[in-house]
Amino acid sequence: MSIIRDVYAREVLDSRGNPTIEVEVYLESGAIGRTIVPSGASTGAFEAVELRDGDKGRYLGKGVQKAVENVNQIIAPEIIGLDAVEQVVIDEMMIELDGTPNKSKLGANAILGVSMAVAKAAAEALGLPLYQYLGGVNAKQLPVPMMNILNGGAHADNNVDIQEFMIMPVGAANFSSGLRMCVEIYHNLKSVLKEKGLGTGVGDEGGFAPNLGSNEEALQVIVEAIEKTGYTPGVDVKLALDVAATELYDETEKLYRLSGEGVVKTAAEMVDFYEELINKYPIISIEDGLSEEDWDGWKLMTERLGKKIQIVGDDLFVTNTERLEKGIKQGTANSILIKLNQIGTITETLDAIEMAKRAGYTAVISHRSGESEDSTIADVAVAVNAGQIKTGAPARTDRVAKYNQLLRIEDMLGFTAKYLGEDVFYNL
């Protein structure tokens, strides 16, 4: 019933107008799985390789025809005839077929496209929603949104150094209420910015991208928007940051350059800076507060702040069990950001989440800045009971698609749906 009959890939566009790969898997039963692979702007050096063509005369070198060809001519013949429910077997076969530690031969984008499409096809063949197929009967926890409403860094053309300023509706009773709270705050933030004569254009992930006097001013206008909406900062809504500090790090001088503020800081001074911010504002989570290779700095940050806030490793861990294991052994961070295309298969993604949870780390499921209408990560978040999701502002269809899928899942789960609010930070 779930035997793979055909696999087909094509080149499509992502939310930034860059080419990406779409894969379709057809089963003998008539079931079809279709998925579009995302792409990042601020990427970790240790991520699996996203294969691009490099032909400057076509899509400025960003075409993915090589990845498409690898699916259609190399991967497809190997997996046609296999059972789509054998996810681990298929993923491991593709990893072996690639034969490199970072999937640079076939491309993580090619491999992930097939991996996700296989899972979707198998779920359809069995008549199950994807979250239940991947997570089983216990998949019932809706994630707290970590909604990016103000963009800086590599996600915007402004003078704000910190890449993402996010809100988390920890006081909501359920997911739909939490989403509504975030949307209301987002619209009120637009009003606050307009009143101050600031720009309301948006960045890659739909958050506003104004020029501000400092990174702290971003927190100030967000708190103002929360209060204007009628919610209490720190009670109903908490704040989260993605600093993307690797983008700020001068490898030669071992210093962090906050160009927007015209200052340079050591790792210890960055930790001091974060401590000042969390003492003044209701910040519950900081992602990539230091560079991906500044392990000593990360250890210091975890020692200083790890009992107060969630410290998330994105570029640090890149959804990779080897790097996560190193972090766990060193006592580095207390949370991992999960991006499927950083590692390249469903199986390896689930392995990373399992390792994190066993070590008492939280797991945050995340989109990329280059997204599409594909909503797979919404199902993954519920499948693994992650409890948190990053998928941008309520302003672009590529972001809203994930929120809408979570609303559908909440409806499907009915009274069995869970929403933990602040209890998702179980290790603080």
From Swiss-Prot:
The keyword Methyltransferase does not apply. It comes from Alkaliphilus oremlandii (strain OhILAs) (Clostridium oremlandii (strain OhILAs)). This is Enolase. Mg(2+) binds at residues 242, 287, 314. GO terms for biological process: glycolytic process. It catalyses: (2R)-2-phosphoglycerate = phosphoenolpyruvate + H2O. Its cofactor is Mg(2+). Catalyzes the reversible conversion of 2-phosphoglycerate (2-PG) into phosphoenolpyruvate (PEP). It is essential for the degradation of carbohydrates via glycolysis. The active site is at 205 (proton donor), 339 (proton acceptor). Pathway: Carbohydrate degradation; glycolysis; pyruvate from D-glyceraldehyde 3-phosphate: step 4/5. Binds a second Mg(2+) ion via substrate during catalysis. Keywords: Cytoplasm, Glycolysis, Lyase, Magnesium, Metal-binding, Secreted. Its EC number is 4.2.1.11. The keyword Magnesium applies. (2R)-2-phosphoglycerate binds at residues 163, 339, 368-369, 390. NCBIfam families: eno. Belongs to the enolase family.
